[in-house]
């Protein structure tokens, strides 16, 4: 199985080492493509890293009128191609996880591409290489999962919409679901280990993110 990322919210301590490291990635122009969010700011100080989930059927690419967002042979959803990007920001508004951000300085959508410049050379993404607690891991499914006491989940349910992702969330083994909203913060919607995608996410209304959609 191909290498991918595993996100374990229970291990995140909010140190933001991942954010600092992401800025150092040579293709990111000094911007971080990863965010650290509060799971439920009103009730806890628990945090979790938010990366691009690299959807199997990425809505950001589906809504792009210029075909500027590509998916490579390994299933990594890439940032928009500058010659094609129209500045329409459809991708920013359509992502159910609230990941893509619009860079107004260079007029381009930018997001996590799983450090393609590093992983293509056999290196871990910057965030996974510096995370002190293992909240962000990178490797093959059969290598990572047996070492954890948590359950990998990559099928997300937003109402009656199912979104399958390349990136896995690691959940407690006795939990069948975790609540998330449409912006990548764990509040208000359901994530389960369901297997089948059903309807197109584009049929759903996307909620406004409480994070800034621009750099």
Residue ranges and their predicted role:
Residues 1-215:
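Non-ligating segments of multi-cofactor redox enzymes
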């Amino acid at each position: 199985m191909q290498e991918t990322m595993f996100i374990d919210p229970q291990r995140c301590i909010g140190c933001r080492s991942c954010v600092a490291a992401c800025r150092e990635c040579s293709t990111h122009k000094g911007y971080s493509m990863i965010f650290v969010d509060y799971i439920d700011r009103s009730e806890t100080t628990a945090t979790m890293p938010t990366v691009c989930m690299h959807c199997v059927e990425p809505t950001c690419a589906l809504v792009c009128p210029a075909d500027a967002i590509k998916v490579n042979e390994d299933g990594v959803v890439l940032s928009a191609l500058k010659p094609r990007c129209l500045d329409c920001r459809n991708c920013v508004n359509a992502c159910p996880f609230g990941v893509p951000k619009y860079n107004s300085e260079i007029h381009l959508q930018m997001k996590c591409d799983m450090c393609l410049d590093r992983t293509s050379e056999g290196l871990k993404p910057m965030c996974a290489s510096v995370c002190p607690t293992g909240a962000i891991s990178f490797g093959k499914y059969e290598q990572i999962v047996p070492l954890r006491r948590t359950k990998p989940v990559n099928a997300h349910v937003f109402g009656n919409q199912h979104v399958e992702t390349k990136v896995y969330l690691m959940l407690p083994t006795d939990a069948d679901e975790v609540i998330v909203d449409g912006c990548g913060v764990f509040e208000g919607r359901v994530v389960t280990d369901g297997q089948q995608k059903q309807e197109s996410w584009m049929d759903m209304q996307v909620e406004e993110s409480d994070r800034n959609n621009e750099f």
